[in-house]
């Protein structure tokens, strides 16, 4: 019966795509790719999904330049639907609607990223200094978003030479230096880029050096010193209508950190930790694409390393984790009368290696997963006011564990979002998806503390997810607003108990609504967001233990940006609020109630008329020195002799100077 329902969903989705594709071929839109005409309430624009129109988040290069984020907490500071836990860079965990980003299909420049390796580490995958765009597709994700998009997708895109070069120039450089109080210390970013005879290139370096910060009460928070050393390199070549892009990203963070970076234990001590990531990718596209031939071919390799020295003669976080992820994607996009259809295949292999320094009778473990999938996604705008984004994918998944036991299965995923625009000011939409996740390994770092008898349950099965959303968008020439109701359910996740790897019997669920509004008047932009979410495991609220699912309750943001062209100045501020959380399940598990907090950030930026290529900026985070821990952090409790949160920084000033040549 389950297979029949899936088959019906797949058939319906494919029939919608095929039927629409029978339309006559028309001339390709001559607008620049990615350009969006100001229609703030339509879910499809130029054959692409409008992520914001269905409750998602989009940060453009202009948005990121305004924020100048030093970390991912500041990157998402204006989004109430996205919460980032505190601490040092490697400890930050990103949750979307209360679900950790490992439950979403995460990519950087189209390259799939590994999930969070251990429940005491962070989920940060990219240096904000390299970013030009971020898309967070919450809920029902498109089939071409990638494999395993249980709760949506996060797409990070980094800058290249063509983004930074001034019009008419073939070479450029950018230097940014800053100093911050409260342990932030020094940060420097240098970039050089050029263009010659169809060849463009970019090299960017970014590093930070500081000390542990203090919270709003003046207490030093151990293990929080900035220590990033990152490199981004890109090259592209265009010839005879072809384009080849090659990218390399390298990130290193080496410093003394807490044993478990997301929680404060009694008598906590710092120990050396190194987190490393390397990513290489090559992509082929056409610059003279036609309606029927618009290909994209990409191959990639990712490596992630986690190294904690052998500081104790027992399993307590001292371990080595190594991951290798490699694969590719081949797809083509067809342009027809009413939109676009993308179809293709993707594949990947993920190798895992663990070493617990021999503090058990099984020191080393090696295991892997493999995936191959085929997908199609259509995005259509019709003349009668309807828009439709619908697609399907079919995947094969294989898991070979540390005992050479092999598990394999296959399954289908479908999605669809339909909207109707009553006029230029009102649009309603509804969407749903059913996603097959393959074998989900999740926080595989648990195996470092398991003995040789640890095995995989023979009944271990693939995960699955369901998403539903509906909403209304309103808008005009200078304003927009919307409400989105969402309901996400994920089941079949892994459970690493003391004896075996099996399936968690609970279904995890996040449901609620989001609100957003924005108004632009001359040189002023004002925006606000509000999110209310109930996150449960089975019938019970999830515990605030920094897991893959976290309670977020009520959260809101308010921001304003003001340009003052007569003085070459820009100023702005952001207010973030989180409501109090108190529930019986958390109290019974010895957690304290989570207090409400309000945090204000502000900035001022000036371009001196005498030095037009220089920008001076001063920013302040936590202006009123609030003592708080960010929502989705491990909450204080009475367990283990008293667990404390990793508190967020107190008031921090940052002074920045930037030159562009």
Curated annotation (Swiss-Prot):
Annotated localization: Cell outer membrane
Domain named TBDR beta-barrel: residues: 170-661
Keywords on record: Cell outer membrane, Membrane, Receptor, Signal, TonB box, Transmembrane, Transmembrane beta strand, Transport
Recorded phenotype for the gene knockout or disruption: The mutant is unable to use hemin as an iron source but retains the ability to use ferric chloride and the siderophore 2,3-DHBA. Exhibits an accelerated loss of viability after 144 hours of culture in low-iron minimal medium. Exhibits significant attenuation in murine macrophages and is unable to maintain a chronic spleen infection in mice.
Superkingdom of origin: Bacteria
PROSITE patterns tied to this protein: TONB_DEPENDENT_REC_3
Keyword match ATP-binding: no
Bilayer topology annotation: Multi-pass membrane protein
InterPro entries, per the entry: Plug_dom, Plug_dom_sf, TonB-dep_rcpt-like, TonB-dep_rcpt_b-brl, TonB_rcpt_b-brl_sf
MF annotations from Gene Ontology: siderophore uptake transmembrane transporter activity
Primary site of residence: membrane
Residues in TBDR plug domain copies: 48-159
Transmembrane spans: none
Secretion signal, residue range per the UniProt entry: 1-23
An example Gene Ontology CC term for this record: cell outer membrane
Induction comment: Induced in absence of iron. Maximally expressed during stationary phase when cultivated in low-iron minimal medium.
Listed Pfam families: Plug, TonB_dep_Rec_b-barrel
PANTHER family registered for this protein in UniProt: HEME_HEMOPEXIN UTILIZATION PROTEIN C, TONB-DEPENDENT OUTER MEMBRANE RECEPTOR
Biological function: Heme transporter playing an important role in stationary-phase iron acquisition and required for maintenance of chronic infection in mice.
Protein name: Heme transporter BhuA
Organism: Brucella abortus (strain 2308)
Encoding gene per record: bhuA
């Amino acid at each position: 019966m389950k297979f029949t329902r899936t088959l019906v969903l797949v058939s319906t989705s494919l029939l919608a795509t095929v039927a629409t594709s029978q339309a006559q071929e028309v001339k390709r839109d001559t607008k620049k790719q990615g350009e969006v005409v100001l229609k703030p309430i339509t879910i499809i624009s130029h054959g692409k999904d409008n992520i914001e129109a269905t409750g998602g988040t989009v940060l453009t290069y202009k948005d990121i330049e305004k924020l100048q984020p030093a970390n991912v907490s500041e990157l998402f500071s204006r989004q109430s639907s996205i919460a980032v836990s505190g601490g040092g860079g490697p400890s930050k965990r990103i949750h979307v609607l209360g679900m950790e980003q490992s439950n979403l299909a995460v990519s950087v420049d189209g390259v799939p990223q590994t999930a969070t390796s251990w429940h005491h580490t962070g989920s940060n995958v990219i240096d904000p200094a390299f970013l030009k765009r971020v898309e967070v597709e919450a809920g029902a994700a498109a089939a071409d978003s990638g494999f395993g998009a249980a709760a949506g997708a996060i797409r990070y895109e980094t800058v290249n030479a063509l983004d930074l070069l001034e019009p008419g120039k073939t070479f450029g450089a950018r230097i940014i230096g800053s100093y911050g109080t409260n342990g932030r210390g020094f940060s420097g970013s240098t970039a050089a880029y050029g263009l010659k005879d169809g060849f463009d290139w970019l090299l960017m370096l970014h590093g930070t050096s500081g000390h542990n910060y203090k919270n709003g009460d003046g207490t030093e928070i151990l293990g929080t010193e900035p220590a990033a050393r990152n490199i981004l390199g890109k090259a592209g070549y265009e010839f005879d209508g072809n384009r080849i892009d090659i990218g390399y990203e390298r990130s290193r963070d080496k410093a003394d950190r807490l044993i478990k970076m997301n929680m404060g234990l009694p008598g906590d001590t710092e120990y050396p930790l190194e987190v490393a990531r390397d990513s290489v990718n090559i992509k082929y596209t056409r610059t003279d694409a036609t309606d029927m031939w618009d290909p994209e071919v990409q191959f990639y390799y990712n490596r992630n390393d986690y190294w904690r020295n052998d500081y104790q003669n027992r399993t307590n976080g001292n371990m080595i984790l190594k991951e290798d992820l490699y694969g590719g994607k081949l797809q083509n996009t067809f342009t027809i009368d009413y939109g676009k259809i993308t179809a293709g295949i993707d594949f990947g292999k993920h190798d895992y290696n663990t070493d617990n320094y021999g503090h058990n009778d099984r020191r080393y473990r090696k295991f892997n997963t493999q995936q191959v999938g085929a997908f199609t996604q259509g995005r259509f705008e019709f003349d009668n006011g309807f828009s439709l984004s619908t697609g399907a994918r079919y995947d094969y998944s294989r898991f070979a564990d540390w005992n050479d036991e092999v598990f394999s299965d296959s399954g289908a995923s479908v999605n669809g979002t339909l909207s109707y625009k009553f006029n230029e000011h009102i649009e309603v939409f509804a969407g749903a998806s059913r996603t097959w996740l393959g074998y989900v390994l999740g926080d595989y770092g648990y195996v470092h503390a398991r003995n040789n008898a640890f095995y995989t349950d023979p009944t271990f099965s693939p995960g699955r997810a369901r998403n539903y959303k509906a909403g209304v968008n309103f808008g005009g020439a200078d304003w927009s607003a919307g409400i989105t109701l969402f309901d996400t359910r994920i089941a079949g996740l892994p459970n690493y108990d003391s004896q075996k790897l099996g399936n968690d019997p609970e279904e995890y669920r996040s449901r609620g609504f989001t609100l957003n509004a924005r108004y632009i008047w001359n040189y002023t932009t004002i925006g606000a967001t509000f999110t209310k979410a109930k996150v449960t495991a089975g019938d019970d609220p999830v515990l605030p233990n920094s897991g893959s699912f976290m309670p977020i309750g009520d959260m809101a943001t308010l921001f304003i940006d003001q340009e003052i062209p007569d003085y070459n100045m820009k100023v702005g501020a952001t207010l973030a609020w989180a409501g109090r959380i108190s529930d019986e399940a958390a109290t019974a598990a010895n957690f304290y109630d989570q207090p409400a907090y309000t945090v204000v950030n502000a900035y001022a930026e000036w371009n001196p008329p005498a030095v037009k290529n220089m920008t001076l900026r001063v920013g302040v985070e936590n202006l009123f020195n609030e003592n708080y821990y960010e929502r989705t952090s491990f909450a204080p409790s009475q367990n283990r002799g008293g667990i404390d949160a990793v508190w967020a920084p107190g008031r921090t000033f940052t002074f920045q100077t930037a030159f562009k040549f």
